[in-house]
Amino acid sequence: MSISKLTASNLTVTLGISMRSGYTIWGTALIFYLVFLGWHENWRGPLTESEIAIFTARAQSINGLSAEQLAHFEMFMRDDDGGEFFMVNLVGFTEGPASHPETGAKVDARELVQSYFRPFAVKILARAGYPAFSARTLSGYIEAWGVAANPGWDIANLMRYRSRRDLLMSATDEDFSDIHIYKRAAIAATFAVPSQSIGGALFS
């Protein structure tokens, strides 16, 4: 066999191996991407009427929710488009040490709230929910009108949820209600507003 034929044969084998390796890499990448999409996106559509009825009953059983909150809760469910959303959340911790709800011991509020957040984060991560943004405040309001006085906000958060169903399944979970006492004890003031992205560099 001539050298030129040997070289051509070796080149063909090398190209064949390279192509198979390329197919393997791209095939693996495609599988991972499809698995990611299956986890990250909501494939079940908006809430159904039966789901709304179930979650409404669960919400009504939660102590401390006002009639206004329940009305907002129902509107939030009925306006569901099946898409992702972000929960805008401001948090103000208790001044000084917080009282542990079980032992009464004085503990750091930021450490105490982790007893709530860590288990909750695990639950929502399983449903493709995660912190999209978290930051500490640097001062009081720079600009504000028509709002109540700043109660002392410490943290600003944006939590991403795959769907309203996923939030409601987590928020009405019995295990979640058991750990909510840590959040109540550690946080002096908070509000949470569900929002949907309309653009921007991070969330477009």
PLM regions and their residue ranges:
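Catalytic cores of eukaryotic secretory-pathway lumenal/extracellular enzymes that build
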Residues: 182, 187-188
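Soluble, non-transmembrane catalytic domains of enzymes that act on hydrophobic metabolites at membranes
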Residues: 2, 187, 199-203
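Short S/T/G/P-rich N-terminal loop/turn motif that feeds into the first structured element of a domain
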Residues: 15-153, 196-204
